[in-house]
Curated annotation (Swiss-Prot):
It comes from Rickettsia felis (strain ATCC VR-1525 / URRWXCal2). One of its GO terms (biological process) is DNA-templated DNA replication. In addition to polymerase activity, this DNA polymerase exhibits 5'-3' exonuclease activity. The gene is polA. InterPro entries: 5-3_exonucl_a-hlix_arch_N (IPR020046), 5-3_exonuclease (IPR002421), 5-3_exonuclease_C_sf (IPR036279), DNA-dir_DNA_pol_A_CS (IPR019760), DNA-dir_DNA_pol_A_palm_dom (IPR001098), DNA/RNA_pol_sf (IPR043502), DNA_polI_H3TH (IPR020045), DNA_polymerase_1 (IPR018320). This is DNA polymerase I. CDD domains: DNA_pol_A_pol_I_C (cd08637), H3TH_53EXO (cd09898), PIN_53EXO (cd09859).
């Protein structure tokens, strides 16, 4: 597609609008919307890569009125204003073009189309080629011998055949046809009832719009003739509006549009300012320049990585590290497999390839095939006088399983980034390295490398790599093959690790400038060690009980299926929404059948089934029960026994520290924070989580913690007083909402009040509350009004928080943690983002309170040399496994520490329960 002597004319705003609607919402490091800017920059880079033009220009509308508005004041009057989050980006689009060194063309009073037409015509007159980059149909009028139109959406040049197929005429007659058709998007009237087929037929017969009106008597259809006669003025105006002005008074100097690579420093600053890290590699390759990942990395040039392959070489590294006092270290893993240990000193990186590839949690130790390096590295990691800089600390802690608690003076760049900008789209520092490797593992290249081997080996190896492309797993490959295939990702990772020290210095400065250093050093970093310990300990699960429960669920599922088939009169795949919809709404002719927006199949979600149930259709109850049991069976009773470790005979979850916007922890593989609690079946599953013999489980659960936090941060006197007086807050709310005395309340009143109390925290709407309480929208709205009247200050807090989030792009919790709300300017998702903003300071404060409690409890347990161990964190709750002879000792310690983790205007209350399994303590 190379066009070395071609002028490329780019429809600027056409690109920007396409980019906005094609791109997921993105925000800059400052929380500003930049999705359209990112998409625009990405498109421009692609054009440079594809076309390699000698001359190029991005052409913009100047805005405001132009000559077409004088002809027809209603021109484009029907267009709605662009979305708010796009409006704030529009003034910056020229910066995108100029930072990529694109010449810009625009002129007051003219649209981009006219400027494109002018430059295209003048360039073509010189015998030079022109390519217009646009999806705008109006520009198809320009097509000619030296002028081509390239549609970036379709990724192809538009041909005359394409124009004829769509409009029924050639490009030179397009203006005539479109004048008759009109253009709704631009509010160009055209002639009523005349579409492309009729218009092209008339132009074929008469040659032009003018000729039609000069020969109206020759129009055979009386109806068409009358329509044309009545619309003559509109048609002639449309002809003027659609035509392009190719004589705009502009200084035409083709040499002024010659493109050259952008200034490296200028481009680096631009990409960093807007957070466009994913464009770094493309820009580097395209412009043959170096873009530093952070502004401060200019101290030393990163040199090619060196491999350390024996203890003597590593000992030399250790001596240098001791002398310098700081080094980088990163354990490169792909899907749990250890691939390489990467070290760095003063921007020089070193690679140690790891032969032990097992991803069994308990295979990591210092007595394996990696003996020659593990002890030397461990001595460095435990040396208090040497600072270690890593990224994603936990894999390194697991590598030194039993001794990980001895590791000291280590910093985690990932946790630093999170403390600075929780909620923003965080990209793994090594993401580009993984992308490079995934490109390297493309199918043709892979097969070529295995040329000469059996087809079976190539196929198996290719399959194993591609199935896990996002993580680059190579666990099924021979070692020599693994290191060969991983060479790209190892080398690219080494380049990044070489910059760890510089990154650390920059992050420390930013943390201190943003008052986030205490969050990182006092909460985020120490909790990482505790989570690692919890993951290694795991929790005991009764596999035999789960197997029995699975069989019990399975038997009921089979019975439900028989009843469903009997009621429907046929067998079908109940798990297929498409088949289920056809059975319910076509075969059985049940009401409420509604096709989903994105597919031709019927909606069969819980809302529809519950509605059918309310109207007495028994099959809906059976289906809801079937779904409940199959989900529990698949998610828990079938899968949990398979996740029990063969060595520890316990289940080991993984806690994620940086996956939420609020600082809240999450759990995966398996997710043990989501085990159901509100149903009898959910409680049966909790019964499977048991204490070891001679131990008890202790649950320590914060009581109504989020309401207590709300009362403090929003300064709600009525709420604070209720908590200080130890009143039942749900009972108090019920009395106010329903105008009843305490003795008149029922459990249903309290249940509704509880839903209102907690719903308000999440910014629930009247519609949402009505649905939850099964009341009318009017009733729900009245409940909310009464709530705001009783608890004065809550509504003000909500409005102030939304306004702060809108102005700053983030909210702040009690401890000063910034919780970014990147969608706050997204028109479609604004309400969702506002609800998130209201809740984030509360949920984020809760998350930090319980993390502080975990840290303090861990210290107390260590200090007293107790065998008590923390095994799970479930948001408001901590689960301990405690020796029976420590229960009486440790229970008051847990309660005291949890209730004194922070100072607020209201007491923090912890409820303690002791039992043999998780069900007993709930």
């Amino acid at each position: 597609m190379t066009q070395k002597n071609t002028l490329l004319l780019i429809d600027g705003y056409g690109f920007v609008f396409r980019a906005y609607y094609a791109q997921q919402p993105l925000t800059s490091p400052k929380g500003e919307p930049v999705g359209a800017l990112y998409g625009f920059a990405s498109m421009l880079l692609k054009l440079l890569s594809d076309f390699k033009p000698k001359h190029v220009a991005v052409v913009f509308d100047s805005g405001g009125k132009n000559f077409r508005h004088h002809i027809y004041p209603e021109y484009k009057a029907n267009r709605p204003p662009p979305p708010e989050d796009l409006v704030v980006q529009l003034p910056l689009v020229r910066d995108v073009a100029s930072n990529l060194n694109f010449p810009i063309l625009e002129k007051n009073g003219y649209e981009a189309d006219d400027i494109i037409a002018t430059f295209a015509a003048k360039t073509a007159a010189l015998g030079e080629d022109v390519v217009v980059i646009s999806s705008d149909k109006d520009l198809l009028q320009l097509m000619g011998e030296n002028i081509k139109i390239y549609d970036p959406l379709k990724g192809k040049y538009i041909t005359e055949d394409d124009v004829v197929k769509k409009f029924g005429t050639t490009s030179d007659k397009l203006r005539e046809v479109m004048a008759l058709i009109g253009d709704r998007s631009d509010n160009i009237p055209g002639v009523p009832s005349i579409g492309p087929k009729t218009a092209s037929s008339l132009i074929t017969q008469f040659g032009s719009v003018e000729n039609i009106f000069n020969s109206l008597e020759q129009v055979s259809s009386l109806k068409q003739r009358e329509t044309l006669q009545n619309s003559k003025e509109a048609a002639l105006i449309s002809w003027q509006l659609i035509g392009l002005d190719s004589n705009v008074d502009l200084d035409f100097q083709l040499n002024n549009l010659e493109w050259s690579p952008p200034n490296s420093d200028k481009l680096t600053g631009f990409l960093q300012e807007y957070g466009f890290k994913s464009l770094y590699k493309r820009a580097e390759n395209l412009f043959d320049i170096k873009i530093n990942d952070h502004k401060e990395i200019v101290e030393n040039k990163v040199t090619e990585a060196k491999e350390i392959s024996n203890a003597s070489e590593l000992a030399d590294f250790a001596k240098k590290a001791e002398k310098i006092g700081i080094f980088g270290i990163y354990l490169l893993q792909h899907k749990g497999d250890n691939v390489a240990l990467i070290l760095s000193l003063q921007n020089q990186s070193y690679i140690i390839k790891i032969s032990n590839t097992s991803h069994d949690l308990f295979s990591y130790n210092t007595k394996n095939n990696n003996d020659w390096f593990s002890d030397i590295i461990f001595n460095l990691l435990t040396d208090k006088s040497i600072r270690k800089i890593t990224y994603s600390l936990k894999p390194l802690l697991k590598f030194y399983a039993e001794q990980s608690h001895e590791i000291t003076a280590i910093e985690d760049l990932e946790l630093m980034q999170y403390a600075l900008s929780a909620g923003l789209s965080q990209k793994n520092l090594f993401e580009e390295a993984l992308k490079e490797d995934n490109r390297h593992l493309s199918k043709p290249a892979y097969r070529e490398e295995f040329k000469g081997d059996t087809e079976a080996l190539a196929t198996a190896a290719y399959k194993s790599v591609r199935e896990d492309a996002s993580t680059g797993s190579t666990s099924k490959l021979p070692l020599e093959t693994k290191f060969g295939k991983m060479s790209n990702v190892i080398n690219e990772s080494a380049r990044i690790v070489a910059e760890f020290t510089s990154l650390y210095k920059q992050n420390i400065l930013e943390l201190k400038d943003n008052k986030a250093f205490r969050l990182y050093s006092n909460i985020d970093l120490p909790i990482c060690f505790i989570l690692d310990k919890m993951e290694k300990i795991g929790i005991k699960v009764d596999a035999n009980y789960l197997n029995q429960l699975s069989a019990e669920f399975g038997a009921e599922i089979l019975k439900l299926e028989e009843e469903i088939f009997a009621l429907s009169g046929t067998k079908f795949n109940i798990g297929s929404p498409k088949q289920l919809g056809e059975i319910l709404f076509e075969k059985m002719q049940l009401p409420f059948g509604k096709a989903s927006a994105k597919a031709s199949s019927y909606s069969t979600g819980a809302e529809i089934l519950e509605k059918l149930s309310e109207h007495g259709y028994n099959i809906a109850d059976l289906l809801l029960r079937w779904r409940q049991l199959t989900k529990l069976k698949n998610t828990y009773t079938d899968s949990l026994p398979k996740q029990i470790d063969n060595i520890t005979h316990r289940v080991h979850t993984t806690f994620l520290q940086t996956s939420t916007t609020t600082g809240r922890l999450s759990s995966q593989e398996p997710n043990l924070q989501n085990v159901p609690i509100r149903s009898s079946e959910g409680n049966k599953i909790r019964q499977a989580f048991i204490a070891e013999e001679g131990y008890k489980l202790i649950s320590a659960d914060y009581s109504q913690i989020e309401l207590r936090i709300l009362s403090h941060i929003a300064n709600i006197d009525a709420l604070k007083q209720a908590f200080i007086n130890k009143d039942d807050i749900h009972t108090q709310t019920a009395c106010q909402i329903f105008n009843l005395q305490k003795h008149e309340l029922t459990s249903e009143h309290r249940r509704k009040a509880k839903a209102i109390n907690f719903g308000i925290i999440y910014g629930i709407s009247a519609f949402g509350l009505a649905k939850q309480l099964n009341v009318s929208n009017g009733e729900a709205s009245e409940y909310i009004k009464k709530y705001f009247a009783e608890y004065k200050g809550v509504q003000e807090y909500m409005e102030q928080t939304k306004a702060f989030a809108s102005s700053n792009g983030y909210v702040i919790n009690f401890f000063g943690r910034k919780c970014f709300v990147p969608l706050i300017h997204d028109k479609k998702l604004k309400q969702f983002a506002e609800r998130a903003a209201i809740n984030a300071p509360i949920q984020g404060t809760n998350a930090d309170i319980i993390k502080i409690a975990m840290i303090n409890l861990d210290q107390e347990i260590e200090k007293n040399n107790l065998k008590t161990r923390l095994v799970l964190q479930i948001h408001d709750e901590l689960l301990f496994e405690v020796p029976e002879d420590e229960v009486e000792l440790v229970t008051p310690i847990i309660k005291k520490i949890m209730e004194n983790s922070t100072n607020m205007d209201v007491p923090i209350i912890t409820e303690i329960r002791v039992g043999n399994n998780w069900m007993e303590i709930h």
